[in-house]
Amino acid sequence: MLLEHPGSSCQNAGNYTRYSSSQDIPVCAGCNQHIVDRFILKVLDRHWHSKCLKCSDCQSQLADKCFSRGDSVYCKDDFFKRFGTKCAACQQGIPPTQVVRRAQDFVYHLHCFACIVCKRQLATGDEYYLMEDSRLVCKADYETAKQREADSTAKRPRTTITAKQLETLKNAYNNSPKPARHVREQLSTETGLDMRVVQVWFQNRRAKEKRLKKDAGRQRWGQYFRNMKRSRGTSKSDKDSTQEDGMDSDAEVSFTDEPPMSDLGHSNGIYSSLSESSPALSRQGGNHPAFPLEHGAIIPSQEPYHDIQASSPYSLPQSPGPLQPLPRHQPLISSLVYPESGLPMAGQSGGQDMTPGVRMMAAGNGPSSDLSTGSSGGYPDFPASPASWLDEVDHAQF
């Protein structure tokens, strides 16, 4: 703001306030001196001499318009250069009135929007590549550089090592698979190979040895498992054949270690001979047919009972004593016979061919049998309802 200082030379002095003392005279913000000039400049609530109000960058006097940032004052151009949008190529500020180019989020001056390789300024419609550092490369230069890079990264020619050099390196490897630097330098001097070539040869040699050991171990384990599988197959076949032989041999085994039943003694027998038992159960001389076993009666068999040896695995617990005559009881069916066996009925035999025990058992006073042997041809004719004949049976009282 431009102000006029009231002075003695001012014709309209009565219209202005006079300063009564030096303390009332404003101090210039630029030179810190009292302003006694006719015109005073006021910026940011501070007073300035007209000659002290200058741009902080270009030092040009500011008379018409100025821009401030903090305590500094700038002209328009310098203010936008410092605090305005900057060019992505030259990092300089761009005035708001200047025409610019944009590539994504980057802004360029017209003369800065150019290829960094051929320095050709890119016009509207040209194809280009935007690098990560905001630099621009035209399409032709980019493809050329890419092809050159691909050619440079091609496989290099292999280094040829003579037999003498190889022998020297092998001897050194046998002494130390991982030699020190001074040893590699000495080998490089002796063989005439590059230091890097010697180092790579030792690295490859160690890797090869490690791989060979690993392959050898894998082969040993594979052979071991194959042998185990083969041995298991052989043992399985042997086991099967052994089982078959065992089945045949088991079929031929006979229990010959035990003495025959006829040779067993009487020291630990269950029953004594029938001659020592009750007279009612002893057999008479002569061959008599066997009679059916009635309910509650014991009929001796054709062969005598033998005692069983105490040490035999087929031994039974000892009998407390000889058999006593069984008490008489009334049988459920006194004359039950099996006609197809050809044996006479116990109640119909004349008694001449029966032993006293059998005669005694056949003479029981029980109800007559409901079985008929007439019209049925040997099979009993039972009534239609089982209850009609089951109810007539008197249960024995033991």
From Swiss-Prot:
PROSITE patterns: HOMEOBOX_1, HOMEOBOX_2, LIM_DOMAIN_1, LIM_DOMAIN_2. GO terms for biological process: neuron differentiation; regulation of transcription by RNA polymerase II; ventral spinal cord interneuron specification. The keyword Zinc applies. InterPro entries: HD, Homeobox_CS, Homeodomain-like_sf, Lhx3/4-like_LIM2, Lhx3_LIM1, LIM_Homeobox_TF, Znf_LIM. Gene3D superfamilies: Cysteine Rich Protein (2.10.110.10), Homeodomain-like (1.10.10.60). Keywords: Activator, DNA-binding, Homeobox, LIM domain, Metal-binding, Nucleus, Repeat, Transcription, Transcription regulation, Zinc. Coiled coil: none annotated. Residues 28-78, 87-141 form the LIM zinc-binding domain. It is found in: Nucleus. Residues 272-282 have a biased composition (Low complexity). Signal peptide: none annotated. Transcription factor. This is LIM/homeobox protein Lhx3.
